[in-house]
Design a protein with these regions (language model features):
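Acidic, low-complexity N-terminal propeptides/linkers enriched in Ser/Thr/Asp/Gly that mediate export
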Residues: 132, 144-148, 155-156, 197, ...
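Mature extracytoplasmic enzyme cores
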Residues: 1-274, 278-290, 311-314, 398-400
């Protein structure tokens, strides 16, 4: 029993009479982009390691409903992978994509979930996982034998620290991947002393793991909160786990808000604004639908990010920019009060964290305006929660204005 994906044999997340299993995505970087040095404008040959190579021209046929003939698209393949974009107007033009999913597939991979579905113990489950390649998963496991485990499964490239963080020179052999991490070197744990395993897309290991991750795909707050909560339980019940799954407590707010409040200058705030500060000071970091504090916190933090990272955000409309993660803003508040990013370059003076945090607070209250005086304007209304159809285009099959 469990969840499946149309077209893929077997149950992806579920249980049988003996074991249960689930998964989340691994945050490992499995895609790199290489700038191709073409020999001439025909773009049929390119340079690599001081020698010329020919591209493979692959004609893709795209069938279109209602059309008598397919659309033909010629793709140039380098030894790295396809040159995805050709238009000079595209930021990724003339870049070859090396993506692990385009590697020659393992023919045994299609059998993994039927094998997991029939597994009776961890040994059989672990043997089935060895055939899995992409997309890499954090598999959690439990059995009637009392075993619990987590296996990180997938074909993960071996790369140097920071390799692939930015576009690589496609003419240099040193920039190629160094192979793939052997399956038996992928992180895994069976029956750990702490008596639980958990994954919420967070980083899987500490820094002692010998293979670089090279990418943090997710902020770690959710994973850290789940692990902290489980660690505090001595005899977890089904009810405890249900409460954890429906918890709206924010570890992010717990860590960020005290730093924001400690940097807030109250001197020029009127009585109404000081009342909002008191509301935030007494907040329990739970995003209850009837609460107002979650509105104040989220809007204040967003305004803080906008002012703090203005030198980066100014390029949003012109070039592709890596967005700064929330944890980095919290880290700036806690550990880097003298960092140059706190300064607004357009002003003659040098701003401090107190200046920026206070400016963001005032900006937040101005943005919310009259809504701050409306007793019915709560997190439920502000959040505007909706559940769209998976296609994102069939509105009658979605739920909107849930609040």
């Amino acid at each position: 029993y469990g969840a499946s994906i149309p077209g893929l044999p077997g149950v992806i997340i579920g249980f049988n009479e003996h074991i249960a299993w689930g998964s989340t995505n691994v945050g490992q970087d499995v895609t790199d982009w290489y700038a191709i040095d073409w020999v001439d404008d025909t773009k049929t040959r390119y340079r690599f390691n001081g020698k010329e190579r020919e591209v493979e021209m692959v004609v893709e046929e795209i069938q279109v409903k209602g059309a008598s003939d397919p659309i033909l698209d010629t793709i140039r393949y380098t030894h790295f992978g396809p040159v995805v974009y050709r238009s000079e107007d595209d930021d990724y033009h003339d870049l070859a994509m090396h993506w692990v999913s385009l590697e020659t597939p393992n023919p045994e991979e299609i059998t993994i979930f039927p094998r997991i579905n029939r597994s009776k113990n961890y040994a059989e489950f672990d043997a089935a996982c060895a055939s899995y390649e992409t997309p890499a998963q954090n598999f959690v496991f439990a059995s009637n034998d009392g075993d619990i485990a987590m296996n990180i499964v997938g074909r993960l490239p071996i790369k140097r620290e920071e390799q692939g963080r930015f576009v690589l020179d496609g003419d240099i052999q040193h920039n190629e991947w160094m192979g793939f991490i052997p399956y038996d070197k992928n992180p895994k744990v069976l029956n750990p002393p702490r008596q639980f395993v958990a994954s919420a897309n967070q980083r899987t290991t500490d820094d002692t793991y010998p293979y670089p991750y090279n990418r943090e795909s997710f902020d770690q707050y959710r994973g850290r909160y789940i692990n902290r909560t489980l660690d505090s339980m001595s005899n977890a019940t089904v009810k405890d786990m249900m409460n954890l799954q429906t918890s709206s407590y924010s570890l992010f707010a717990e860590e960020a808000l005290p730093l924001m409040l400690s940097n807030l200058n109250l001197t020029n705030l009127n009585a109404i604004l000081k009342g909002l500060v008191e509301l935030l000071e007494s907040w329990d970091y739970i995003f209850e639908k009837e609460a107002v504090a979650p509105i104040l916190f989220t809007e204040w933090f967003e305004d803080l990010e906008e002012v703090l990272w203005d030198e980066i955000n100014v390029y949003d409309d012109s070039i592709s920019v890596l967005q700064v993660r929330k944890w980095r803003t919290v880290d700036m508040l806690e550990n880097h009060p003298l960092n140059v990013f706190w300064d607004i370059t357009q002003t003659p003076g040098r701003e401090t964290p107190e200046d920026i945090v206070t400016q963001a607070f005032v900006s937040m209250t101005e943005d919310l305006g009259w809504r701050l005086q409306d007793s019915e304007y709560t997190w439920e209304v502000h959040r505007e929660t909706y559940i769209a159809h998976l296609s994102r285009s069939l509105e009658p099959f979605g739920r909107y204005n849930i609040s």
